Amino acid sequence: MESTSSPELLQMARWLAGDFSNQEQAWENPPFFASIRVAYRPLPTAVLGGIGFYVEQAYSGHLEEPYRQAVVELTQVGDGIVIRNYRPLQPQRWRGCARGRAEQLSQLSAADLAYLPGCDVQVKRQGSLFVGVTEPGCRCCVVRNGQTTYLQTTLHLSENEFCSHDRGMDPVTHRQVWGAVAGPFRFRKVVDWQAELLQ
């Protein structure tokens, strides 16, 4: 692993590298939480020049049809970590690569990605957790059902659990328009890919 990566950055990357499921939460509270899988597949170092992940989020019964595809980059900024978010310009080309066709990710390059300004997540270590929130400024724009909103993300990451809460907020009233109303999704790691980091 690169000597320029801090111990905390590497620790967060190890904990994030994997396939996560909220099956237990979905069983406990089916009216509010669908059964979802979210995969953070480590990218070859050459793609972003450091620690990056290809991300797919899908309903558990339809892993081959992800409803969210993204690329994230972990960087050290001061005494914290920043998660930079990108969207693939041709998402169909990479569909399924988080699980079944991971070797194809070696063909991914920065030219295949569009950076999402205002959508960085600022992360701090708090005891045994990494805690992150969307950067200030309400600039991470998301259009949902024809309505412009801004994304507000919070996340908690521990060794085996990843909790996230994405909410779309009205830019005028700052009230929630979309997203889980019953609190964050709680994902448990079911597959570990940390051995693939920084290859």
Curated annotation (Swiss-Prot):
Pfam families: CpeT. The keyword Lyase applies. It is an enzyme of class 4 (lyase). Its EC number is 4.-.-.-. Keywords: Lyase. Disulfide bonds: none annotated. InterPro entries: CpcT/CpeT, CpcT/CpeT_sf. The keyword Ribosomal protein does not apply. One of its GO terms (molecular function) is lyase activity. It comes from the Bacteria. Belongs to the CpcT/CpeT biliprotein lyase family. Covalently attaches a chromophore to Cys residue(s) of phycobiliproteins. This is Chromophore lyase CpcT/CpeT 2. The gene is cpcT2.
